């Protein structure tokens, strides 16, 4: 194998199999583009993004790791979200949860 070389199997790779998903329309009401990364807790995205925020608690974009979705000013777009896996704790982002998703504080 050459350093940095990929050895990828033939066939389909299934991501987030058997995970709860949610599809919703998101509008950028701001005057600047907003980019959201693959593992960003969608509930805590920029307030200029308009959508049913409470429904997205515990979800992230259902896209490949390391990628992002860009929302242009005035743009409406449909996205699919996937439930966050693991121990369901969220730290950082905009600081709105800072712990367990079930019992986290929300203002």
Swiss-Prot record:
Pathway: Nitrogen metabolism; urea degradation; CO(2) and NH(3) from urea (urease route): step 1/1. GO terms for biological process: urea catabolic process. It is found in: Cytoplasm. It is an enzyme of class 3 (hydrolase). Keywords: Cytoplasm, Hydrolase. Its EC number is 3.5.1.5. It catalyses: urea + 2 H2O + H(+) = hydrogencarbonate + 2 NH4(+). The keyword Electron transport does not apply. InterPro entries: Urease_beta-like, Urease_betasu_sf, Urease_subunit. Gene3D superfamilies: Urease, beta subunit (2.10.150.10). One of its GO terms (molecular function) is urease activity. One of its GO terms (cellular component) is urease complex. Belongs to the urease beta subunit family. PANTHER family: UREASE. HAMAP family: Urease_beta (MF_01954). Heterotrimer of UreA (gamma), UreB (beta) and UreC (alpha) subunits. Three heterotrimers associate to form the active enzyme. This is Urease subunit beta. The lineage of its organism: Bacteria, Pseudomonadati, Pseudomonadota, Gammaproteobacteria, Cellvibrionales.
């Amino acid at each position: 194998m050459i350093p940095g070389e990929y050895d990828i199997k033939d066939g389909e790779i299934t991501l987030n199999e058997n995970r709860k998903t949610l599809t919703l329309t998101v509008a950028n009401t701001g005057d600047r583009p907003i980019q959201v990364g693959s593992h960003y807790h969608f509930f805590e995205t920029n307030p200029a993004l308009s959508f049913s925020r409470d429904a997205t608690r515990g979800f992230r974009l259902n896209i490949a790791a390391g990628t992002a979705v860009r929302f242009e000013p005035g743009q409406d777009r449909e996205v699919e979200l996937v439930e966050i896996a693991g121990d369901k704790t969220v730290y950082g982002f905009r600081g709105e949860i800072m712990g367990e998703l079930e019992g986290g504080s929300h203002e």
